[in-house]
A protein has these predicted regions:
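Short alpha-helical donor nucleotide-sugar binding micro-motif in glycosyltransferases
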Residues: 62-68
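Conserved catalytic-core segment of nucleotide-activated headgroup transferases in glycan assembly
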Residues: 3-58
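Short hydrophobic beta-strand element within catalytic cores of glycosyltransferases
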Residues: 93-96
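Aromatic "clamp/platform" in nucleotide-sugar-dependent glycosyltransferases that forms part
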Residues: 75-76
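Short acidic/histidine- and often glycine-rich active-site loop of Leloir-type glycosyltransferases
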Residues: 98-114
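A charged, aromatic-enriched C-terminal amphipathic alpha-helix characteristic of glycosyltransferases
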Residues: 117-172
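Short alpha-helical segment that forms part of, or immediately flanks, the ligand-binding pocket
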Residues: 62, 85-89, 100-104
Length: 172
């Protein structure tokens, strides 16, 4: 099972992380890259990286995850969200809308109101909420509440979604 090997390649123990926010999703309309780019203008104190702008090897991508504090999602379509799990594996945090598979997979601390990114108008109408959430999470990254949530969410996803243990047991 491919996800079970991530722990061999992504390390969560990098002590100092940089103020980097990643967009590791493909460039597709339902991923709303335009919102990410607009947030970059609104919050220039952070380094915003669209991973598609670079020809990263898997090793380079994993190192970037380990260096970064956040993966941002404004997705309108998602079934699993591997990159949001990868940032947890790297000791960082996802920031996801409270919709789609994110509702059941991610702890509330990592969610923002869905209305903030339902569409461009929703973003324009509610961007102060989203900007405030990003600033709060980035500024308090080392707070016990966030660090504990990273660890517990990583463990729950590993046990519930990113393991083939139940499949192996069924096959025996």
């Amino acid at each position: 099972w491919p996800m079970e090997y991530l722990g061999n390649y992504i390390r969560p123990d990098r002590i100092e992380k940089d103020d980097i926010i990643l967009f590791p999703h493909r460039d597709a309309p339902e991923k709303q890259l335009n919102i990410f780019k607009e947030l970059e203008k609104e919050l220039p104190q952070y380094k915003w990286i669209n991973c598609n702008d670079y020809n990263l090897t898997k090793k380079e991508y994993n190192q970037l995850l380990e260096q970064s504090k956040m993966v941002f999602s404004a997705n309108l379509q998602e079934t699993l969200g591997i990159s949001c799990y990868e940032i947890l594996m790297a000791g960082g945090m996802p920031l996801v809308p409270n919709r789609l598979s994110y509702v059941e997979m991610y702890e509330d601390i990592f969610k923002y109101p869905s209305k903030c990114t339902l569409d461009w108008k929703g973003y324009q109408d509610h961007k102060t909420i989203l900007i405030g959430k990003i600033e709060t999470m980035m500024n308090n990254f080392n707070a016990p509440e966030i660090q504990d949530a990273i660890k517990s969410n990583r463990q729950s996803l590993l046990e519930q979604y990113f393991t083939a243990t139940n499949l192996y047991q069924e096959l025996q």
